Amino acid sequence: MIAVIMLLSFTSAYAQEAEETSDSAGWWQQTKNRLGNIADNGAEEVYLSGYAYHGRNTYTPERIRELNEKAWGIGGGRTFRNADGNDESLYFFGIRDSHFKPQLMAGYAYEWVFSVPKTPIEFSAGYTAMLVSRQDYFGGFPFPLPLPIAGIGTKKAKLMASYIPRLSSNKGNGDVLLLFARFEVD
């Protein structure tokens, strides 16, 4: 019985000490804190999509005529300009995919921002990690997808691009450049 009490006392003291240490939060708590900060303090944004370019060396002219390159869509999100001057975003987005079906996306993006001196213009480059739901993959079940992103514009309005690479030597998949705009509405 004394051993159990000593063990519980030791465990309790150890747990309290761990809670007081800033490094003890761990990656899960740090991730939750970061995402919570974006959600609470980020600027509200609207996303508009309109064009998906399919690589002409990947698809035959006949196939390109069958594909939808007018990837109309809308979404929303929040972007927080962090202490390093870079953008972190949480977003959701729905577009009409290459096969005229709905494609739903939700994710996180990180962009390193490079300002043009003495102008409001800035360039950005980074990555996004998202969950995507498409009818032609996994029956619409969401799957993870990391992609590169880039942008040009101002803090309040940017033309953005993301590239879906060709993942195999087979022609007819990937090699798509998606263009969209991001507008701050706060």
What annotation goes with each model-predicted range?
Residues 15-78:
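Short glycine/proline- and aromatic-enriched beta-strand/turn motifs that initiate or cap beta-hairpins
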Residues 33-43, 81-87, 113-124, 186:
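Short loop/turn motifs that connect adjacent beta-strands in outer-membrane beta-barrel proteins
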Residues 47-51, 91-93, 124-130, 160-164, ...:
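Transmembrane beta-strands of outer-membrane beta-barrel proteins
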Residues 48, 74-78, 92, 106-112, ...:
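Residues on the lipid-exposed face of transmembrane beta-strands in outer-membrane beta-barrel proteins
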Residues 52-54, 174-186:
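Outer-membrane beta-barrel "beta-signal"
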Residues 53-58, 95-99, 115, 130-136, ...:
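Sequence/structural signature of outer-membrane beta-barrel proteins
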Residues 68-74, 100-106, 141-146, 153-155, ...:
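Residues that define the transmembrane beta-barrel architecture of outer-membrane proteins
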Residues 82-88, 156-161:
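Repeated loop/turn-to-beta-strand initiation elements of outer-membrane beta-barrel proteins
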